[in-house]
């Protein structure tokens, strides 16, 4: 092969000509190290509830979390993300349950951390699981009040980080 010029005037493309070569020299690989396992949690004991809107996905009561975490660790998954299901009776316009130190997320976090496992835990800092209107913020005059929402989200973050 004769090279006509030098970089930057000549840019060789031979490693991009064929699909197999592009796959061979690709910079990115996906492994279990790149995965985060979502865990949907609910109130109760000994509960595994099918989520109708998501095939083959379930909500688990806190006492079942160990089983899920063990599976994640055995598969080499380094992190889980917790998503709470809040019953309507615990929801209100201000999302007050988000600031309850004994809410579902906080109890699940304490249970996972108590075992001191080598797994990362991610939680959603959001109000939509806790508000009766389903928005991710405090509504005032049919608009989200960002300042009030941020105050609550800061406190929710601090609570989850404990």
Which sequence ranges carry the predicted segments?
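Alpha/beta enzyme core
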Residues: 2-10, 18, 27-36, 42-162
């Amino acid at each position: 092969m004769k090279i006509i010029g030098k970089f930057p005037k000549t840019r060789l493309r031979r490693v991009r000509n064929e699909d197999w070569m592009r796959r061979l020299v690709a910079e990115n690989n996906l492994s279990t190290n790149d995965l985060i396992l979502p865990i949907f949690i609910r109130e109760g004991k000994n509960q595994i509830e099918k989520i109708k809107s998501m095939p083959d996905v379930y909500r688990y009561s806190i006492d079942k979390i160990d089983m899920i975490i063990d599976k994640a660790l055995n598969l080499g998954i380094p992190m889980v993300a917790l998503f709470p299901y809040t019953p309507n009776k615990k929801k209100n316009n201000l999302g007050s349950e988000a600031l309850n130190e004994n809410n579902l997320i906080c109890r699940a976090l304490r249970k996972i951390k108590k075992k001191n496992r080598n797994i990362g835990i991610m939680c959603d800092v959001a109000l939509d699981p806790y508000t009766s209107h389903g928005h991710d913020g405090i509504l005032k005059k049919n608009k989200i009040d960002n300042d009030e929402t941020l105050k609550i989200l800061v406190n929710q973050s601090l609570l989850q980080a404990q």
